């Protein structure tokens, strides 16, 4: 099947490359910019569900355009996090990611609803697994910091990430990209074809990609790669615009992801950066993502526009044989499969009533269904009876319905001031049915009703300078623990955020900054371990208590001369648990630190691009980037001594030659081969589980170097 997928993708990419005839309109590759721009260079974003310039929108937002992603070799949202202040994403498996913005919305396991929302073309993705998925044919990424629940709904208390893909074009367009890097045999090929079918009435776009890498970890027990990664993606879009005031866009996609789950090495401490894994199995896991969505937009006249978005998304995963004890002793083995099906429907009405007042109102509905079937085999040695095997099969089905109504009024008393007042009401009903080895358990239910208000006041002091203040509340829904857990449910968490910011934009200079304070209640943080029904132990999610997070962030783009661009961002955030009584009361254990798991106190990035004109359309571009992350608390259940991971800096660089629509580049990532941990679990967790005790760590990627080429007509 993998060979068939690769062949299909390669055929499309090859067709895109060979089909590029001189008759197609040429569009020379632009210097990487911050986001999609209008003809005069003004950056346009849709952070408030309407087109606005980046310098005018009163939200802390970072916009990264598709050409920048390609030039930087960024292939997933997780990888793009280094370019956005305040956004922290780590991962310990192909379908797992930890995400937070400004220390809020912390999501450590995939069973917990995300605290930072991910939206692809306006459609909510309900699981952190999507953060690792390949980015295909992306126009730009927008990272919105602070609660966005008023317009985006629940599960955005930390912020929201918008991924906007390229739409069908009015002229024929072809894009092709390819790269190869070592020493882990990492390569990528992608392509897209777009153009009209019937003039400007009907257009199409098709894109596909293949990516694979061996990774930098080795299973020394099996003499195999322990962190390989393989993806294939394809999507197709049709856009119908029979009249000037109406359009219908339909898109379908299919992603295959084959990789490894939780490839932890047994390490002696947080400075032991070994890359050997000793599992009895390869811990392989495969995912299939597919879906279809449609967006209808109509100009109703009188200053009103109606948008209706419907989507169906499906994710299936299968793990044929997983090692649950993280070592050579064959104690815990797991076989499992699950599915997540999501259907959403949203209707929005954007109306301009007068020159001073406009509104955006809408309703939303989603239905999620999760099915899981997991079989655990626990092998023990009894002192009297000898070897004993416990086989436990757990089947669960969770269903969730969410209903919401929302509205925002925008009031501009004059050309300088704007007041935006929004409110959203979400009602969520969740039901879980499950069984353990054929024994049906009582049905678990969870209901919530939440209001999410937001008030923003902004002033345009000059055409170049804007300031704003805002207060907003966001919340994340609760959920269910495994059927074997003693506590089946946990509640949602919420945050009030207070923010003041400023933006300045002129030719050759863009500056933005913000100060923020978050009052974070019922924090869903570090999970714990509890006795499992039927024997053994089980991981439980729970509300840990309250958190206070405050800080400052800065973002800048400077162009000292026409051919030289500098960009940078910095966030300092002090996120600490102020009340852990909920955690202590539930687990009977103490926390060894008031820090949040995997959350640094600072994040920083700086990059430079210098263009050397060679005459005509030819140029050489010298690029470099420096990305840093502060010290972090490892995942730990130790009650007295916290485990702190070191801070680190990564350095990337490239040199590219461009001639017309063609670009060829040499690049290197993590040039100085810096050692750091992507994820880390302190040994108390294994000790409590009755397993051979050892710290567990996953090291980040080593130095990678290679060549990259792109073509765009």
Where are these regions (language model features)?
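N-terminal Sec signal peptide and the immediately downstream disordered periplasmic leader
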Residues: 1-84, 194, 244-245, 292, ...
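N-terminal periplasmic accessory domains that precede
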Residues: 77-78, 98-100, 116-119, 143, ...
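Short acidic/polar hinge/loop motifs at secondary-structure boundaries
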Residues: 121-147
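Transmembrane beta-barrel wall of Gram-negative outer-membrane proteins
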Residues: 173-175, 181-213, 217, 221-259, ...
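Membrane-embedded beta-barrel scaffold of Gram-negative outer-membrane proteins
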Residues: 190, 293-323, 460, 466-472, ...
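Structural signature of Gram-negative outer-membrane beta-barrels, strongest in the C-terminal barrel
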Residues: 239-243, 253, 349-352, 364-366, ...
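Gram-negative outer-membrane beta-barrel transporters
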Residues: 360, 412, 418-419, 517, ...
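C-terminal beta-signal and adjacent terminal beta-strands/loops
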Residues: 521, 626-637, 656-713
């Amino acid at each position: 099947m993998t060979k068939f997928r690769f062949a299909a993708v390669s055929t499309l990419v090859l067709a895109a490359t060979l089909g590029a005839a001189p008759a197609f309109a040429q569009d020379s590759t632009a210097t990487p910019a911050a986001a999609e721009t209008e003809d005069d260079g003004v950056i346009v974003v849709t952070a408030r569900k309407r087109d606005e310039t980046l310098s005018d929108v009163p939200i802390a937002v970072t916009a990264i355009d598709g050409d920048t992603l390609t030039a930087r070799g960024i292939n997933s949202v997780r990888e793009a996090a280094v370019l956005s202040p305040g956004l922290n994403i780590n991962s310990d498996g192909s379908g797992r990611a930890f995400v937070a913005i400004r220390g809020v919305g912390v999501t450590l396991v995939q069973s917990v609803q995300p605290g930072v929302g991910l939206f692809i073309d306006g459609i909510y993705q309900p699981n952190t697994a999507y953060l690792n998925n390949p980015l295909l044919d992306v126009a730009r990424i927008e990272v919105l910091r602070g609660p966005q629940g008023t317009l985006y709904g629940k599960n955005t208390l930390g912020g929201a990430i918008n991924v906007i893909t390229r739409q069908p074009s009015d002229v024929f367009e072809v894009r092709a990209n390819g790269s190869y890097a070592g020493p882990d045999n990492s390569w990528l090929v992608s392509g897209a074809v777009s153009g009209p079918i019937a003039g400007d009435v009907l257009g199409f776009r098709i894109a596909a990609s293949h990516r694979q890498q061996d990774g930098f970890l080795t299973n020394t027990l099996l003499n195999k790669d322990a962190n390989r990664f393989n993806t294939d993606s394809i999507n197709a879009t049709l856009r119908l615009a029979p009249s000037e005031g109406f359009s219908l866009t339909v898109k379908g996609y299919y992603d295959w992801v084959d990789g490894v789950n939780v490839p932890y090495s047994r390490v002696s401490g947080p400075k032991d950066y070994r890359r050997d894994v000793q599992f009895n199995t390869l811990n392989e896991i495969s995912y299939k993502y597919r879906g279809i969505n449609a967006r209808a937009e109509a100009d109703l006249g009188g200053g009103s526009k109606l948008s209706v978005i419907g989507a169906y998304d499906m994710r299936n995963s299968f793990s044929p044989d997983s090692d649950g004890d993280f070592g050579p002793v064959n104690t815990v083995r797991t076989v499992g499969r699950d599915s997540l099906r999501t259907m959403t429907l949203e209707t929005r009405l954007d109306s301009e009533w007068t020159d001073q007042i406009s509104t955006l109102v809408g309703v939303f509905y989603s239905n999620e269904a999760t099915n899981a079937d997991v079989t655990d085999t626990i092998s023990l040695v009894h002192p009297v009876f000898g070897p004993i095997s416990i086989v436990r099969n757990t089947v669960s089905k969770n269903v969730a319905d969410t209903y919401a109504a929302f509205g925002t009024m925008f009031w501009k008393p004059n050309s300088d001031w704007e007041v935006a007042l929004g409110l959203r009401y979400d009602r969520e009903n969740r039901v879980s049915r499950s069984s353990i080895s054929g024994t049906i358990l009582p049905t678990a239910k969870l209901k919530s009703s939440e209001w999410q208000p937001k008030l923003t006041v902004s002033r345009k002091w000059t055409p170049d300078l804007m300031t704003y203040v805002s207060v907003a509340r966001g919340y994340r829904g609760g959920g269910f623990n495994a059927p074997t857990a003693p506590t089946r449910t946990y509640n949602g968490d919420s945050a009030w955020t207070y923010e003041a910011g400023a933006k300045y934009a002129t030719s050759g200079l863009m500056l933005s900054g913000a100060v923020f304070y978050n009052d974070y209640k019922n924090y869903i943080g570090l999970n714990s371990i509890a006795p499992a029904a039927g024997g053994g132990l089980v991981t439980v999610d729970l509300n840990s208590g309250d958190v206070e997070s405050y800080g400052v962030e800065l973002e800048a783009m400077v162009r000292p001369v026409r051919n030289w661009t500098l960009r940078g961002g910095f966030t300092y955030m002090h996120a600490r648990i102020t009340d852990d009584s909920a955690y202590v009361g539930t687990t009977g254990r103490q926390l060894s630190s008031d820090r949040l798991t995997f959350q640094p106190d600072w994040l920083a990035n700086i990059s430079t691009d210098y263009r050397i004109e060679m005459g005509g359309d030819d140029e050489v571009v010298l690029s470099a980037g420096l990305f840093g992350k502060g010290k972090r608390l490892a995942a730990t259940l130790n009650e007295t001594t916290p485990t702190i991971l070191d801070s680190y800096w990564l350095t990337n660089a490239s040199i590219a030659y461009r001639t017309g629509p063609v670009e060829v580049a040499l690049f290197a990532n993590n040039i100085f081969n810096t050692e750091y941990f992507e994820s880390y679990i302190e040994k108390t967790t294994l000790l409590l589980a009755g397993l051979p005790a050892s710290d567990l760590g996953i090291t980040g990627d080593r130095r990678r170097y290679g060549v990259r080429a792109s073509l765009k007509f």
